């Protein structure tokens, strides 16, 4: 009897477990009138992104972000007429909507042709608020045959400001960039208009200057002449903390009409540029005080993952409640304007190390992000997949007009040509010598042209269409990688190029995404040990130059070499896979170890004295770049077995165990003492990355002749500059940069 009751209870529980999801989730039923429309809303945003709004049963509403995924975004973007989704946003990133929340707990596979085919709680069944409205970011590429009017019913408001600009005042500096002072002009559907300055305040100017890329404003010294203008906007009132003028209160005239501006004229602002956008900007940037904030992983100036300095170590910020006000505080602190976008979900790549801040809620007038209310982090609060990022407004400098790419197959690639003075006030185009050209120089070119990250830096461009430009005008270019223009980099004062001819001029290939490799520093510290390895086991290692030079004079096969061994775990935390520069047809077969080398040098291992002298070294040719393990939800793509493709997928890592050949430094000739262990990934910048400053790792090393200890292992850019100098006690290579 008891067994029968137990069986019935189990059956009931199983049925309840099966039926419950069907009670809560159902395929979204069609609209009663069959007319479902979609649009993107919110502000500020681009035309291919925004809060997703659905027109159902004659009423516009939103979609809740509960259970929202990229698969949902793919379906919605296709219904909006775009080919696919790039990302999605939660927590009303584009502002809260109004009216109904039509859909909640939507779960799509990604291949559905309509959101109606996805599972959800049903139309109008939601427990969300508009603070949970979902948004999408679609790839800016239209589906063939999709008429714009069919899929996006844009709610174009007469009052919407499409663009804002400063028209320079007449005077000595009218043609100088950036434009820091001028008449505020606003673009509407029907053209440009002015703002009546009656009641205009310095707080209003602060908002406009922020949009123009300037951190602060000043009083206007000169008033413009009387303008016969269309004053579409009147009575503007800002608090000064808005990220966009559209967030201020104001009065509008009707379209195609204007109202007079009694006793006033056009609004004029005067802005103060950040140090990096002033005359002599390179020299002044070097004199800047030690920063407490930085941006990492971005392709362009003024964008990147937000990192803050606490004590002597850099850490990231969690994206909970991250918004434009908080992002604008970061941007102004760094000498930019207000934030154009406050990005969540590690859109600029994941950081490493500590996460210092969570639930940051700035008012907008704080001098530093540390001044804003925020929560400390516990282990359960955040992961680096939630690192906050920003895209700041920066002043227009016209840098892209001084450079162009020619001969390439797309606008993202080509031979680099510079516009430089040619004498007599004439400017002419010229080429750059390809000698010594690397992906770091390509990074600067792609940044200057606004084309994203560098994919490749090319020393020969003979395979691209030739142009009538043949003269070399720059050579010996050596960049750190973070410069805004190529002329900011070191270069020869007099052109000197070993290989003449346009076919040996520098070229680049740019890309929206880039990889970013970092070493797991704690693992190096945990796995280090010393091995006395017999010479008869080291023939292959000797063939591949993995031993010190003194090994050539050893009594082979007798004796041994003393090896400092450790594991290297190399993570790709960027936004694109790390691939060898050369295709598999160019890989070199090494018979002794029975494997292919896809890169000549992938990693340097160095043991340095405290004065910076190299006392022992090693290297690791990338005989097998593959995905050893990946984070949850990420699939392996690269495997070396059977001459497979080599690389490291985003979110995966390649592990070189301590017990494999050449995973060591030969310290047979090293005396006991204190040293620095240094590991540098991708040391020759052979493959482009979004950030080279985190490619170096250092540890304090103590060797007593029998045992070895490592401590304070850290990435080269994880400490403040002062702490790093104290650590190394010597000048030289810092953060894998030239110093």
Swiss-Prot record:
<dbReference type="GO" id="GO:0005507">
    <property type="term" value="F:copper ion binding"/>
</dbReference>
<feature type="domain" description="SRCR 2">
    <location>
        <begin position="166"/>
        <end position="272"/>
    </location>
</feature>
<dbReference type="GO" id="GO:0061053">
    <property type="term" value="P:somite development"/>
</dbReference>
<dbReference type="GO" id="GO:0021510">
    <property type="term" value="P:spinal cord development"/>
</dbReference>
<keyword id="KW-0964">Secreted</keyword>
<keyword id="KW-0886">LTQ</keyword>
<feature type="domain" description="SRCR 1">
    <location>
        <begin position="38"/>
        <end position="139"/>
    </location>
</feature>
<feature type="disulfide bond">
    <location>
        <begin position="108"/>
        <end position="118"/>
    </location>
</feature>
<keyword id="KW-0801">TPQ</keyword>
<feature type="disulfide bond">
    <location>
        <begin position="77"/>
        <end position="138"/>
    </location>
</feature>
<feature type="disulfide bond">
    <location>
        <begin position="362"/>
        <end position="372"/>
    </location>
</feature>
<protein>
    <recommendedName>
        <fullName>Lysyl oxidase homolog 3A</fullName>
        <ecNumber>1.4.3.-</ecNumber>
        <ecNumber>1.4.3.13</ecNumber>
    </recommendedName>
</protein>
<dbReference type="GO" id="GO:1905590">
    <property type="term" value="P:fibronectin fibril organization"/>
</dbReference>
<feature type="disulfide bond">
    <location>
        <begin position="209"/>
        <end position="271"/>
    </location>
</feature>
<keyword id="KW-0186">Copper</keyword>
<dbReference type="InterPro" id="IPR036772">
    <property type="entry name" value="SRCR-like_dom_sf"/>
</dbReference>
<dbReference type="GO" id="GO:2001046">
    <property type="term" value="P:positive regulation of integrin-mediated signaling pathway"/>
</dbReference>
<keyword id="KW-0479">Metal-binding</keyword>
<feature type="domain" description="SRCR 3">
    <location>
        <begin position="293"/>
        <end position="393"/>
    </location>
</feature>
<dbReference type="GO" id="GO:0005615">
    <property type="term" value="C:extracellular space"/>
</dbReference>
<dbReference type="GO" id="GO:0006954">
    <property type="term" value="P:inflammatory response"/>
</dbReference>
<dbReference type="InterPro" id="IPR001190">
    <property type="entry name" value="SRCR"/>
</dbReference>
<dbReference type="GO" id="GO:0018057">
    <property type="term" value="P:peptidyl-lysine oxidation"/>
</dbReference>
<feature type="disulfide bond">
    <location>
        <begin position="433"/>
        <end position="497"/>
    </location>
</feature>
<dbReference type="GO" id="GO:0030199">
    <property type="term" value="P:collagen fibril organization"/>
</dbReference>
<dbReference type="InterPro" id="IPR001695">
    <property type="entry name" value="Lysyl_oxidase"/>
</dbReference>
<feature type="disulfide bond">
    <location>
        <begin position="64"/>
        <end position="128"/>
    </location>
</feature>
<dbReference type="GO" id="GO:0060021">
    <property type="term" value="P:roof of mouth development"/>
</dbReference>
<dbReference type="GO" id="GO:2000329">
    <property type="term" value="P:negative regulation of T-helper 17 cell lineage commitment"/>
</dbReference>
<keyword id="KW-0732">Signal</keyword>
<dbReference type="GO" id="GO:0030324">
    <property type="term" value="P:lung development"/>
</dbReference>
<comment type="function">
    <text>Protein-lysine 6-oxidase that mediates the oxidation of peptidyl lysine residues to allysine in target proteins. Catalyzes the post-translational oxidative deamination of peptidyl lysine residues in precursors of elastin and different types of collagens, a prerequisite in the formation of cross-links between collagens and elastin. Can mediate oxidation of lysine residues that are acetylated. Also able to catalyze deacetylation of lysine residues.</text>
</comment>
<dbReference type="Pfam" id="PF00530">
    <property type="entry name" value="SRCR"/>
</dbReference>
<comment type="similarity">
    <text>Belongs to the lysyl oxidase family.</text>
</comment>
<feature type="disulfide bond">
    <location>
        <begin position="331"/>
        <end position="392"/>
    </location>
</feature>
<dbReference type="GO" id="GO:0016020">
    <property type="term" value="C:membrane"/>
</dbReference>
<feature type="glycosylation site" description="N-linked (GlcNAc...) asparagine">
    <location>
        <position position="256"/>
    </location>
</feature>
<dbReference type="Pfam" id="PF01186">
    <property type="entry name" value="Lysyl_oxidase"/>
</dbReference>
<feature type="modified residue" description="2',4',5'-topaquinone">
    <location>
        <position position="656"/>
    </location>
</feature>
<dbReference type="InterPro" id="IPR019828">
    <property type="entry name" value="Lysyl_oxidase_CS"/>
</dbReference>
<feature type="glycosylation site" description="N-linked (GlcNAc...) asparagine">
    <location>
        <position position="611"/>
    </location>
</feature>
<dbReference type="GO" id="GO:0004720">
    <property type="term" value="F:protein-lysine 6-oxidase activity"/>
</dbReference>
């Amino acid at each position: 009897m008891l067994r029968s009751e137990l069986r019935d209870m189990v059956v009931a529980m199983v049925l309840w477990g099966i039926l419950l999801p069907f009670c809560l989730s159902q395929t979204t039923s069609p609209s009663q009138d069959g007319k479902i429309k979609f649009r993107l809303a919110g502000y500020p945003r681009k035309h291919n992104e925004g809060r997703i709004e659905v027109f159902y049963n004659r009423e516009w509403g939103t979609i809740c972000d509960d259970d929202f995924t990229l698969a949902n975004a793919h379906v919605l973007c296709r219904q909006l007429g775009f080919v696919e989704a790039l990302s999605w946003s939660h927590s009303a990133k584009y502002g809260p909507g109004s009216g109904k929340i039509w859909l909640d707990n939507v779960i799509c596979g990604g291949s559905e042709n309509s959101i109606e085919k996805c599972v959800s709680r049903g139309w109008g069944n939601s427990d969300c608020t508009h603070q949970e409205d979902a948004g999408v970011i679609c790839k800016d590429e239209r589906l063939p045959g999709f008429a714009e009017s069919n899929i996006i019913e844009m709610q174009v408001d007469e009052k919407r400001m499409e663009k804002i600009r400063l028209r320079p005042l007449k005077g000595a500096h009218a043609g100088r960039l950036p434009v820091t002072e001028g008449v505020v002009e606003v673009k509407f559907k029907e053209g440009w208009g002015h703002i009546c300055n009656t009641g205009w305040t310095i707080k209003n100017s602060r908002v406009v200057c922020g949009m123009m890329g300037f951190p602060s404003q000043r009083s206007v010294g000169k008033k413009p002449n009387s303008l016969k203008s269309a004053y579409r906007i009147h009575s503007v009132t800002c608090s000064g903390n808005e990220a966009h003028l559209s967030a201020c209160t104001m009065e509008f005239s009707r379209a195609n009409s204007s109202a007079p501006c009694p006793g006033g004229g056009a609004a004029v602002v005067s802005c103060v540029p950040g140090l990096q956008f002033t005359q002599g900007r390179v020299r002044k940037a070097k004199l800047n005080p030690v920063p407490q904030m930085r941006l990492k992983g971005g392709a362009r100036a003024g964008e990147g993952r937000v990192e803050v300095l606490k004590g002597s170590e850099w850490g990231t910020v969690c994206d909970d409640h991250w918004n434009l006000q908080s992002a604008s505080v970061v941007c102004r602190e760094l000498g930019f304007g207000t934030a154009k976008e406050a990005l969540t979900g590690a859109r600029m790549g994941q950081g490493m190390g500590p996460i210092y801040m969570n639930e940051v809620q700035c008012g907008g007038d704080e001098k530093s992000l540390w001044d804003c209310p925020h929560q400390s982090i516990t282990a359960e609060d955040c992961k680096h997949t939630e690192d906050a990022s920003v895209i700041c407004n920066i002043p227009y400098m016209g840098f892209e007009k001084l450079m162009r790419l020619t001969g390439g197959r797309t606008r993202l690639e080509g031979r680099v040509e510079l516009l430089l003075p040619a004498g007599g006030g004439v400017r002419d185009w010229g080429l750059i010598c390809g000698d010594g050209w690397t992906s770091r120089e390509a990074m600067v070119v792609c940044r200057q042209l606004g084309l994203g990250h560098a994919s490749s830096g090319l020393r020969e461009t003979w395979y691209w269409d030739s142009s009538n430009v043949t003269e070399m005008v720059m050579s010996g270019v050596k960049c750190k990688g973070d410069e805004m223009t190529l002329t900011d980099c070191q270069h020869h004062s007099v052109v000197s190029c070993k290989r003449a001819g346009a076919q040996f001029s520098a070229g680049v290939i740019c890309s929206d995404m880039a990889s970013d490799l970092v070493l797991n520093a704690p693992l190096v510290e945990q796995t280090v040990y010393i091995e006395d390895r017999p010479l008869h086991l080291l023939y292959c290692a000797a063939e591949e130059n993995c031993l010190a030079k003194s090994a050539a004079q050893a009594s082979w096969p007798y004796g041994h070499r003393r090896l400092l061994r450790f594991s290297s775990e190399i993570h790709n935390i960027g936004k694109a896979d790390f691939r060898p520069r050369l295709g598999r047809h160019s890989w070199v077969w090494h018979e002794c170890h029975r494997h292919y080398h896809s890169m000549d040098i992938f990693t340097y291992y160095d043991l340095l004295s405290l004065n910076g002298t190299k006392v022992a070294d090693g290297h690791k040719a990338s005989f097998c770049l593959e995905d050893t393990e990946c984070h949850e939800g990420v699939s392996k793509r690269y495997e070396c077995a059977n001459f497979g493709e080599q690389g490291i997928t985003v979110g995966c890592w390649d592990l070189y165990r301590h017990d494999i050949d050449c995973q060591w430094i030969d310290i047979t000739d090293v005396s006991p003492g204190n040293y620095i262990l240094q590991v540098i990934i991708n040391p020759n910048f052979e493959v482009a990355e979004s950030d080279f400053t985190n490619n170096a790792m250092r540890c304090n090393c103590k060797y007593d002749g029998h045992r070895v200890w490592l401590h304070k292992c850290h990435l080269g850019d994880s400490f403040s500059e002062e702490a790093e100098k104290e650590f190394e006690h010597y000048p030289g290579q810092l953060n894998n940069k030239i110093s």
